[in-house]
Amino acid sequence: SENLKIDTMAIELQYLLVSEEPCKTFNSTPLTEELYEIGTKLDYMENRLGNDNPSVLQMKEYYSMLELRHWLFVKKTKKECEINRTYILYFYSNEGDCQTCEEQGYVLSYLHKKYPEMNIYSFDINIDNVALNTIKRAYNVVTAPTLLINDKNYEGFMSARKIEETIR
């Protein structure tokens, strides 16, 4: 947990440094990969300590804020630097009310490996946080799984093929 805090602080600092010259540093930044690694560590903590562990929930909320900030950065650089980049916001639930969420997670992991330049952000739909609630309202996210692919809302499970067709 302490290593996770250090990693997240490093990402915050790197974000500030990169945002000074977004077009110059966009392709060279390991920011995306580090965010992905922290997500993997968070998954490990969730599996070891449980979804409802207070430390896990707090870290998950903090990680969600890092993801939102990174997503905003990617959106900004995509527009300012004219970079063709796909981003997906994935809303899931761990509360037993989403039969296809785990499978959707596997599909997105597969796509991340196949297309490393694709940015995928995962959010627990049940986290009650002002920033996440703003995104959910703005994009009408009401159920899990929901994918926001380049700002378009897709409710329900999507296969890898269907997602690939959407981003072409």
What function would you assign to each model-found segment?
Residues 130-142:
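Short, intrinsically disordered low-complexity segments
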Residues 68, 106-110, 161, 165:
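Solvent-exposed, polar/charged alpha-helical surfaces in well-ordered, non-transmembrane soluble domains
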Residues 1-86, 142:
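Non-globular targeting/processing and membrane-anchoring segments
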